[in-house]
Amino acid sequence: MAKAKLGIRPIIDGRWGGVRESLEEKTMNMALAAKKLIEENVFYSDGTPFECIISPCTIGGAAEAAKCADFFSTQNVCATLSVTPCWCYGSETMDLDPLTVKAVWGFNGTERPGAVYLAAVLAAHAQRGLPAFSIYGKDVQDVTDNSIPDDVAEKILRFARCAAAVGQLRGKSYVGIGAVAMGIAGSFCDADFWQEYLGIRAEWVDMVEVTRRVELGIYDHEEYERALKWVKANCPEGFDKNPENIRHTPEQKEKEWEFVVKMTLICRDIMLGNDKLNDVRPVGAEAEHSGPKDGWHEEALGRNAILGGFQGQRQWTDFMPNGDFTEAMLNTTFDWNGKKEPLTFATENDGLNGLSMLLGKLVTGRASLFADVRTYWSPDAVERVCGMRPEGVAKDGFIHLINSGAAALDATGVCKDKDGNAVMKEWWNVTDEDIDAMLKATDWCPADLGYFRGGGYSSHFKTQAVMPMTMIRINIIKGLGPVLQIAEGYTATLPDEIHNKLDMRTDPTWPTTWFAPRLTGKGAFKDVYSVMANWGANHGAISYGHIGKDLITLASMLRIPVAMHNVADEDIYRPHAWSAFGTKDLESADYRACAAYGPLYK
């Protein structure tokens, strides 16, 4: 499938005889400037620039609008940016494709009324039920000025970044391996939601498929041997918390390591496919099974996934090694092959949390952390247990983010930028030094056999730096539909005297992140307790950076209302028509607008 692209539509006054001719160069300069800005700053999740194409002609009326639409229809255009320095003919030139996300940039100048066209065409968009984002600079520019002001660039880039996410979602699959884990509602795969709001196909694969591929050798054997050698050299075994009388033997543990490495290759191949499976031929006992003898061609295709999940508990983990290693490595920005794009893979098959992780990945290019939103620690409770109060970003209390070790190793917080600051990097900027640091900050503890009878290994680390982070969650509410929750904040580092005591009170073999949301003093962000109390599920996705404003824009494109956030009103950017649903209470207006327009693909 061709990559989704952004189409730029240069709109012009259609009057020949001097008017149109005088505007051609300026109009195309706007289009070229927008293309350059976007392609230098917005990237697909594979790290390549988000491709922009420009209409083969300027658009002065319906005939040229149709010519542009015909061209875009061959290019997998997921979003359009219409640009103009002048008055043009609103509904005659607008983008009428109901499946594209739309924005219009009207040049703020005095020679020609770009603002008047912008207002006119946005009125047409609102009347036709085709919401569009408005882009208009705060300061007047001279007509000869082809630069893009900072405020305009910010809106163009946010629109493009979020439109790229919409385009990358459409036409892909969610592959849920297994079913609902332990009654967790997010594990229930609502195919209508995935299809209508995201354009994603829901796929189901029984966990027995993993067993089949292990037993029949349906994986790349050369990669397996290389991966196992790398794991033995780079993934040290952590402490075993199990009583000695029930601990697995060294021989059992060795078999578990072999199994979880195979399982990692297999889950990846189920989702993405692997051409090498075409050449994997059954040998020995494997050849006695019915099935292909010249390679595993169906399995090589994969399932066109953009994300997946693994049920694990309980039917699998009661007798097989758990999925912690697999989940952690797929979600991380590297493996035995070096740096790689993280493959979003949800613990306990919680697809809604997987989707939340994926949205964070698509707008940042970085790994996302999967965790239980486990415990709220107030300063008073910390003092009672530890004899001292937390300080710094944790002074008002914090939330313990922890889950059996499916967390991306990027969350160790040991990667550094050029200035020495701790970061989670875009995967394509991860260095060998970063990989080495993340591996050294992590060990792999044998699973708690009381909970995971089949064994397995959990990544074990603590987030070692204060970093800006955003916690994200999509929930589905009966009678309402999907809603998005956002909490910007910081990871916290605690003195060992506090960290050790608090960490030992839960499962100390799991990775720990202490998270302090940024408080506003009102609503769900009145205090840390209120953030925890209003969170809509047991899981959260945590992404690097304060990306709430991007997520709010993206949610409006998908028609998903935002139920909770701590982003300033002045940073909220939604389609222009949202203001028709109210300007005083933006949260309520968002609900009304999303309800009025409905799912993007319904």
Regions inferred by a protein language model and the residue ranges of each:
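An N-terminal assembly and electron-transfer interface module characteristic of large anaerobic redox
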Residues: 1-602
